[in-house]
Amino acid sequence: MAAPMDRTHGGRAARALRRALALASLAGLLLSGLAGALPTLGPGWRRQNPEPPASRTRSLLLDAASGQLRLEYGFHPDAVAWANLTNAIRETGWAYLDLGTNGSYNDSLQAYAAGVVEASVSEELIYMHWMNTVVNYCGPFEYEVGYCEKLKSFLEANLEWMQREMELSPDSPYWHQVRLTLLQLKGLEDSYEGRLTFPTGRFNIKPLGFLLLQISGDLEDLEPALNKTNTKPSVGSGSCSALIKLLPGSHDLLVAHNTWNSYQNMLRIIKKYRLQFREGPQEEYPLIAGNNLIFSSYPGTIFSGDDFYILGSGLVTLETTIGNKNPALWKYVQPQGCVLEWIRNIVANRLALDGATWADVFRRFNSGTYNNQWMIVDYKAFIPNGPSPGSRVLTILEQIPGMVVVADKTAELYKTTYWASYNIPYFESVFNASGLQALVAQYGDWFSYTRNPRAKIFQRDQSLVEDVDTMVRLMRYNDFLHDPLSLCEACSPKPNAENAISARSDLNPANGSYPFQALRQRAHGGIDVKVTSVALAKYMSMLAASGPTWDQLPPFQWSKSPFHNMLHMGQPDLWMFSPVKVPWD
């Protein structure tokens, strides 16, 4: 006879885990021809509890006699690298990763070790995040053979080109940092798969392994460039809001960001890295400028992806996605001569001391993928309670395929007292080249830089920001049922939960009428907020809240939502978390 249905919370979790494991097994079978996209389960999955403990620390040690690497529990000061994961997802919506490397060892070993220890403390979260987000990518149930083969070939060719460039330029700081980034990814994947083999020469990165977690943003543009039938971003799909606010009298400069993403991506980790890498491969090079950094991130991802970083160099770097709607530009997306955005992002954060240098590093080898508006705030140039320094406080960069435009916008920040970013290009040349004029002609002001709903809400409400708490309030704002700026005249019903600083597209009626897909009901919206200030950034800290906004709206609850059948392993059912000050010791 059939076993009785277990309707308890634990029973539902167990059924979800069994379903996920079955999917994982099937995915491994179907994807074996494409290099096996699903990584082998880590040793943590031999335990009964699918979630990590409240706290876990591990160190990677090098045995001097044998030359072997080994993982040990706890902190060991002579280790190559160490990491602690504090799992507070059920309490705050966040886990916290604190990772450090030992400058007594060479950079390459440090980088590999950083990946190893991160995977060793977060393997359960990595597995669940993989299952929630990318297990079906290129199979088993959404499998476009032609596209997946093209993607695999593109990534293999790009990895091979970068390996050649690293070999041709062994003394280059740029390529040294690219190599360290790939070694960190290699260590992450090796550790998760239960092997520790430090590569001394060339090394391989699986094109459809953990690289998929790093290139989530790049895929938004690789998909249309490689002619995928069903592409990731829908027309008008927003991906983040950001606000930089100069307070009256210049007594503070606040930087805030909220990420718009699928709700399946809500397994979150705030990470702190302390990396003792040198700028270049020789001992005489100084330490990288951005060797200390904190950022909002995801399991198995070695950069932010949101993106939001506080750097020890005094910079805060963040972006919102602008995309590309001009098919003629996809010709610039090629595997040779380009470095994917996720790597350029990391390298710029490591090497730059100011906004201009950051832009110079980032714009090299433009891939035309993960096309964003970047904001680089330099707190070193900001004078609290003082006049405008004239330049250097705010640098804006916009990238699309074949084009990168950069400008110092300090003067504009001091004139208007704010800079808002909401997925539409600021520079006219980028706006026109990316094909947005056609969308304005077809759909109206929704795609306009100055008349978009978020542009108007920011313009109306930015003056209400007085401190970090009121900044959080604005960045979580969504009163779509009552705010006239949230109305969509071509929609039925007209109030639309996408038209807010922090979207809640799950609240749009499923049976409504909408002019384009982004305005429909989706398991998508603003899933966090991060805010920093002069004082917070000085101590590498931020105020952060995880999950969809619930300030003016009912909190999101998986079990009561239209999307309760979506896989969301490891996530709380009810998302009703208040902001927390990130607790670094």
UniProtKB/Swiss-Prot annotation:
Chief localisation class: other
Pfam families reported for this sequence: Phospholip_B
GO cellular component: extracellular region; lysosomal lumen; lysosome
Enzyme Commission number(s): 3.1.1.-
Disulfide bonds: 138-148, 488-491
Molecular function GO labels: phospholipase activity
Superkingdom of the organism of origin: Eukaryota
InterPro entries associated with the record: PLipase_B-like, PLipase_B-like_dom1, PLipase_B-like_dom2, PLipase_B-like_dom3
Post-translational modification: Glycosylated; contains mannose 6-phosphate sugars.
Functional summary from the UniProt entry: Putative phospholipase.
UniProt subunit comment: Interacts with IGF2R.
Protein name: Putative phospholipase B-like 2
Organism the protein comes from: Rattus norvegicus
Encoding gene, per UniProt annotation: Plbd2
